[in-house]
Amino acid sequence: LGDVYKRQVLYVIRCLLDSDIPLNEGCFAPLDLVVPEGCLLNPRPPAAVVAGNVEVYQALCNLLFAAFGAQAAGQGTMNNVSFGNGRCQYYETVAGGGGAGEGFAGSVGLQSHMTNSRLTDPEVLESRYPVRLESFVLRSGSGGQGRWPGGDGLERTIRFLEPMSVSLISGSRQVPPFGLNGGASGACGENLRLDREGVAHPLPGAVQLELLAGEAIRMLTPGGGGMGR
């Protein structure tokens, strides 16, 4: 994770600096990064780091923006979904709510911070893979309240038409994205397995499972934290 945290610091500093300041090595010159070996951001082998990029950096961005008092926590996760069987493989990340800041509400149903990813169009997804996209809607009310509210997350349900191996890596399932300066926290995310009878079974934030044809995964992504009372 050594290079990962440096990129997060540069990203946050770049966002907070005036736009006319050029992005170059000089941005780091005044900074002294103290990250002791063996800590979360600088682990020793054999520490598990499989989600160090996609998950840890989202939490780190929230921490850094909050430390400067600039923004409440966004969803804090990439909501990673991957599935496949003997003839297809697919990977996506699902957007959520952004954190609010002084003078602006959080983004609604968008990837925030260093994500740089887009979802496959529903028509393309269903034509190329044995799945049916049953819901893809805003999760109304999941953003934290405040003078400037946090953004709402999303609900996304994918039903599999063939047996499928599914993996989920997601955060903010137990600890909600925090508000700032009296703003309320956003809602935690949820992962659910829907069986063929439509019964919902809660899943942990990180899980790998085998689904039968006709079963589905529903992901409720976190909302962002609110800013101010």
Question: Regions from the language model: what does each represent?
Answer:
Residues G2-R229:
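Glycine/proline-enriched, intrinsically flexible loops and inter-domain linkers
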